[in-house]
């Protein structure tokens, strides 16, 4: 806090946290979310053959985080769909991206400099949703740390966590694309951000919520814009996780290698012992047979 005061960021952070998200930031969030839907294989054909299914998929991309959060907190799953302004705005974006003549709207928002602006604004919405989700969960469960973390996490990356269900709506089933097994950068960042905001909400992190929102938004915007501009699918956390995870959880291939060697030693010893025992046994039988023959000749 003293550092933020020295840098005169306290007032800026407070003003930034009070900026309304609707309609400009929400519009950017809807545009980027539905763009990613159109990138999915078969999404364009689905919009032509089954427009209702395509619209439902678009609404999941835009509001899936709210649905999951309501599910966790035991609230009506369709509660957010009572927000007519957001639903109409998201529906208009879906129609323009999929059905605009000559794909003019799609080409404009896909132009990289324009797209980077929308991506940056989407991360502003993501961080704010994490903070609001944790505050909402804290209202119901004052000491439920894991509930707050889970709610903030799904608020920030709900659509990714619902990817398998969204695929079913498109008639696709890819269980290997489970987001929990293969977390993308936004999903990991949402989880880490949910932990930070939970610590701040429970007063274990000595920083104001406005300052944390401002700092974490800068981090998310910088990383996501860089990854989008370079067309990279890597994560800034990979290097850190590469050092920490083997220490805390062991190497992923170490245990398998040990078991393979262990099994190999048994399998190598078993057949080898059998092969070595078999010739020894046959030699004894041969020698015994030769002795019997000699005894018969002697008789």
UniProtKB/Swiss-Prot annotation:
GO terms for molecular function: identical protein binding; metal ion binding; potassium channel activity. Channel activity is activated by a change of voltage within the sarcoplasmic reticulum lumen and blocked by luminal high Ca(2+) levels. The keyword Nucleus applies. One of its GO terms (biological process) is release of sequestered calcium ion into cytosol by sarcoplasmic reticulum. Its main location: membrane. A 1,2-diacyl-sn-glycero-3-phospho-(1D-myo-inositol-4,5-bisphosphate) binds at residues 122, 126. Residues 281-290 have a biased composition (Basic and acidic residues). Residues 260-299 are annotated as: Disordered. It holds the Pfam family TRIC. Residues 1-18, 73-85, 166-178, 231-234 are lumenal. Keywords: Calcium, Ion channel, Ion transport, Membrane, Metal-binding, Nucleus, Potassium, Potassium channel, Potassium transport, Sarcoplasmic reticulum, Transmembrane, Transmembrane helix, Transport. It is a multi-pass membrane protein. One of its GO terms (cellular component) is extracellular exosome. The chain crosses the membrane at residues 19-39, 52-72, 86-106, 145-165, 179-199, 210-230, 235-255. It comes from the Eukaryota. Ca(2+) binds at residue 74. Intracellular monovalent cation channel required for maintenance of rapid intracellular calcium release. Acts as a potassium counter-ion channel that functions in synchronization with calcium release from intracellular stores. Opened by a change of voltage within the sarcoplasmic reticulum lumen. Belongs to the TMEM38 family. Homotrimer; conformation seems to be controled by binding to diacylglycerol (DAG). This is Trimeric intracellular cation channel type A. It comes from Homo sapiens. The lineage of its organism: Eukaryota, Metazoa, Chordata, Craniata, Vertebrata.
């Amino acid at each position: 806090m003293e550092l933020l005061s020295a840098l005169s960021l306290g007032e800026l952070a407070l003003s930034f946290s009070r900026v309304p998200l609707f309609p400009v930031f929400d519009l950017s969030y809807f545009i980027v979310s539905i763009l990613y839907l159109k990138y999915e294989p078969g999404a364009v054909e689905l919009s032509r053959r089954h427009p209702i299914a395509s619209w439902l998929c678009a609404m999941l991309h835009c509001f899936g985080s709210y649905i999951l959060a309501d599910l966790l907190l035991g609230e009506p799953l369709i509660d957010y769909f009572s927000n007519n302004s957001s639903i109409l705005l998201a529906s208009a974006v879906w129609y323009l991206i999929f059905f605009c003549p000559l794909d003019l709207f799609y080409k404009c928002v896909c132009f990289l400099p324009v797209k980077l602006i929308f991506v940056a604004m989407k991360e502003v919405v993501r961080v704010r949703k994490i903070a609001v989700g944790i505050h909402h969960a804290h209202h119901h469960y004052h000491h439920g740390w894991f509930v707050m973390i889970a709610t903030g996490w799904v608020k920030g990356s709900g659509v990714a966590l619902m990817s398998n269900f969204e695929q079913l709506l498109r008639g696709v089933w890819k269980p290997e694309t489970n987001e929990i097994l293969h977390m993308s950068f936004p999903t990991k960042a949402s989880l880490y951000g949910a932990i930070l905001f939970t610590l701040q909400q429970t007063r274990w992190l000595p920083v104001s919520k406005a300052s944390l929102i401002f700092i974490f938004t800068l981090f998310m915007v910088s990383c996501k814009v860089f990854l989008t501009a370079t067309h990279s699918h890597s994560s800034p956390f990979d290097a850190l996780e590469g050092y920490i995870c083997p220490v805390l959880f062991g190497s992923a291939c170490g245990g398998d290698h040990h078991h393979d060697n262990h099994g190999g030693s048994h399998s190598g010893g078993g057949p080898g012992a059998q092969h070595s025992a078999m010739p020894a046994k046959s030699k004894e039988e041969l020698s015994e047979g030769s002795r019997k023959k000699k005894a018969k000749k002697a008789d």
